[in-house]
Amino acid sequence: MAKEPLPGRVKTRLAREVGSTVATWWFRHQLKKTIRNLNDPRWDVIVSLSPDIFVKRRNFWSPEINCIPQGRGNLGQKMRNIFKLFANHPSCIIGGDIPNITKLKISKAFRKLGSRKFVVGPAEDGGFWLIGHQGQLPRKLFEGVRWSSPWTLSDTIETFEDQPFSSLSKLQDVDSLADLEALKTKTNH
């Protein structure tokens, strides 16, 4: 899932610290890198975009990248829409701001979906960098989740309605300059 990578529309918390141009450049670079690095014959990489009109703006995207609109609603409603669209297949949703995501981590997520209805990849900030699902969706999936908070992951798990889930290793997403600096420190050691 990604927002239109234009100044003022992405990484707004990071932009307050480093400026809108730098934050947007970082996001564009990271998003393209993620798409390139996760391309694999074992799964389809599909970019779900917001606003929906951005799907038609092909100048940013390579023609071989499959893009779909996110649709209306809050983040939970948009993710629910994606899971419904791919209801007949195990599906994983990630954001474009997770630098250390790898094919191995995605492969593990799909393997875990072989025995569970959900898989989550917890983020350092209390959210998640990946959520995967297979089968019928719980009726109240994502309802009442406090987005962009330390409770996002725990609130989300509560909406699974006791369906079994697995967890992946914790990763850092990038929302602030401190996140970027922490990431740089981790990769230099």
Question: Language-model segments: which ranges?
Answer:
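Conserved alpha/beta core of the MobA/IspD/sugar-nucleotide pyrophosphorylase nucleotidyltransferase superfamily
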Residues: 154-189
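A short, N-terminal amphipathic alpha-helix
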Residues: 25-43
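N-terminal nucleotide-binding beta1-loop-alpha1 segment
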Residues: 1-13
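Acidic donor-binding segment of Leloir-type glycosyltransferases
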Residues: 42-66
